[in-house]
Amino acid sequence: MKKIKNNTTTITNIIASSGSFDIELIESLGTADYESLMEISASLAEDYGEKYLLTKNTINKYFNRSGALPIIARFENKIIGYIIGMPLELLSQEPWVRLDENYGKFNTLYTYAFVIKNDFKRKGYAKILKKVYISWAKKKEGILYNTGHVKSGISKKFKGQIKIIAEINNWQGTGKIFEYYRRNLDPEKIYEN
């Protein structure tokens, strides 16, 4: 895992852009952007509880981790959202992850977090961010699947080959039913060995 020591500057590559809206792949997240990310995570906490608030430690752990796919969305140079993909194997401390049939195969990217600032919801930004994320997940060597936990009923709105693996009551203490889904990123088996 990469560590940031007194690095305030974020290093990114713009991977999609339209006018004042940019989507950036993070190479190294600097401390200057931590506050924005913690503020945005508050909208997750409103829906699911305070454990969904980002901290400096969780930001460093997930945004600056080797193997992760951290992507941010900016509007007029301000961060308005983020999505983080993690190989299942980097989440081995989570009891549920070892039950996934692909655990240990290094072929699955788990969507750890996906959030857009409340003011920017229902304006198409989240949809574009997710499309770019899926596109980049497909480009990661050896990755054939994308998984994640979403509220019950959400995954049926997804495009592509989606399979619900499990339903979990009271996911992570939220009091809500969540689905664990798997998206096949390579249904034509173009990239499979």
What are these regions (language model features)?
Residues 79, 83-113:
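Conserved acyl-donor/pantetheine-binding loop and adjacent beta-alpha core of acyl/acetyltransferases
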Residues 137-152:
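Conserved GNAT acetyl-CoA-binding A-motif
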Residues 153-158:
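Short, charged/polar "capping" segments at the starts of alpha-helices
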Residues 60-72, 86-92, 110:
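A short helix-loop-beta-strand connector motif used in the catalytic cores of GNAT acetyltransferases and
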Residues 113-116, 122-135:
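Conserved acetyl-CoA-binding loop-helix of GNAT-fold acetyltransferases
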Residues 147-150, 161-180:
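Conserved catalytic-core motifs of GNAT/GCN5-like acyltransferases
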Residues 58-59, 96-102, 165-169:
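Short, P/G- and charge-enriched loop/turn segments at secondary-structure junctions
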Residues 5-58, 70-75, 79-80:
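Short amphipathic alpha-helix that is part of the acyltransferase structural core
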